[in-house]
């Protein structure tokens, strides 16, 4: 648990770095932030040059007199100091207040500040999220390398002083993402914290906690939040400094995806598709790590299928005949279709191409696992995944036997009985109810889906 002393050292570089902020340069260098000031803090663009540190001293006295009650005037004074001087002293106070309001319900923690006005609360959150990247980039600039990583000068005195505030910032952002219900505020937190990712990887434990918080937002909420969370996750994975962090990001993302496929219903299908399509992007970033993770997970699928065929117990069948397993097959077909796409390879085989054969073997085995007509929807799901792989990679997959067995089954060889049943939602069905067997409506739906699936 942190205490206020963690942020004390930031005062040490205040005097050396104080200078007037050139707003014209700010508008040119960071137009997005300048636009934010124009729209939300117009008064900060017109503060007088005669204002000096005496105002800050007055604020300190007010803080003591009011028992550190945070007011809008105090917050605006901090904003001015951050804009004019990139003031580490003002940054320290801002982060203390940020941490205090986010842990206000924790009676064990001694709070440096407290807030009574909801407007001040919102302003504090937005100010911290918006100003922190600006101040850090000024004091500890970074460079982006060709491989997508960030090079931060971690051997400087400034970083030695500011690395604890960075840790405090991310711990507060993590708490915000886990507890704040306002979607708009969460969206801002995701977008702004992404700008701080270059400084994140210096603390592995905090980086992992941040990834977990991102995955929580990626797997729930509205699409806008999901996409913003994934954008942060993508940058975090791409810029990871070591293989352990890359593996953690890939594994955690995959496990989060699979957990969210258990409840495959019409109203969840769109979200699952979004998660699969975005998670697929992570496996295009680091070739070696992606191959190792994909190899391990496809091997697990193969072992589950082998145990099912060998032991033939109900428990083993249930391991394979469930939505998470089918979504795993579909996800890896997405990954391999993307990483091994002929247009992407341009004559140079992808490092992932050797995984196509084992995935195809497992998929075909699952497709023929249960020959009963009730499981034809499962077979058609497998066929759809394999067709995607065929079209992208131009590999040969013997799908004809799977399709012919369906067409030669009793569902089509006998005249189907009429029924007043509603059409099945085959996208969210892998086993048809017994009432649909030998019915005209079921046969028509299967035939329609086979026709659509033909390349």
Predicted segment positions?
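Charge-rich, low-complexity intrinsically disordered regions
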Residues: 1-269, 273-377, 381, 389-455
